[in-house]
Amino acid sequence: MGYNKSLRYSRHNGTTCVIDNKHLKTLGSVLGDVRHKEELIREAQFDPIKDIANQYMVTEDPFRGPGKNVKITLFKEIRRIQPDTMKLVCNWSGKEFLRETWTRFISEEFPITTDQEIMDLWFELQLRPMQPNRCYKFTMQYALAANPDYVAHDVIRQHDPYYVGPDNRERINLSKRGLAFPLTCLQSIYNENFEEFFDQVLWPYFHRPLVYVGTTSAEIEEVMIEVALLFKIKEFAPDVPLFTGPAY
């Protein structure tokens, strides 16, 4: 007697049947049992490693932590990048940076008030190719702990760079370990004297990044560079409830 589908049990009841006093099982159920046993073996091998790993703590991505993100766009600029070279993105002490930043692209008012504490600071870089249908990747190099008196070169040669993310966006954490940012009147300093805002307010407590950007193209490319500072702030709860009306 051959295999007859009518003699087989329903899929909802099981995957085995008895034909001519022989216990038969589908090949799919056999493969499923093998896979299940392999998963049990892998779990048994992983359990001792997991017990040891649970004794240690690791830090999560601080960008995804608690707090509110406040983004300030410093400038947007189109620059031409030569092949096999990298261009300095931002010269923090240059007059061109101050003029371009504060006269054209900067926000009129600083969005962080005095009752908010800065928890973290990020340097955000967004790159966009200006010509369509260009097949190349963006490369990047940066330094954080540079000497304040160091004069950065505008153009350097590419040497072991790394690729910018798939969305052509990169964030660099500028926090210094062991230094807490004090509560200061940031809004008034920013609006009254923006030229000293970086040197006197930010850089004593955060790293001043030197960021270089390049491409993998063999031709001269025009790139739109958008530079922004992203503040992660912690808002304090008000001292009195914000209720209005005759009952209060």
UniProtKB/Swiss-Prot annotation:
Cellular component aspect of the GO annotation: viral occlusion body
UniProt keywords, alphabetically: Viral occlusion body
Claim: Hydrolase is one of the keywords in the record: no
Pfam families: Polyhedrin (PF00738)
InterPro entries: Polyhedrin
GO terms assigned for molecular function: structural molecule activity
Record's function text: Component of the virus occlusion bodies, which are large proteinaceous structures, that protect the virus from the outside environment for extended periods until they are ingested by insect larvae.
Family, as annotated: Belongs to the polyhedrin family.
Name of the protein in its database record: Granulin
Taxonomic placement: Viruses, Viruses incertae sedis, Naldaviricetes, Lefavirales, Baculoviridae
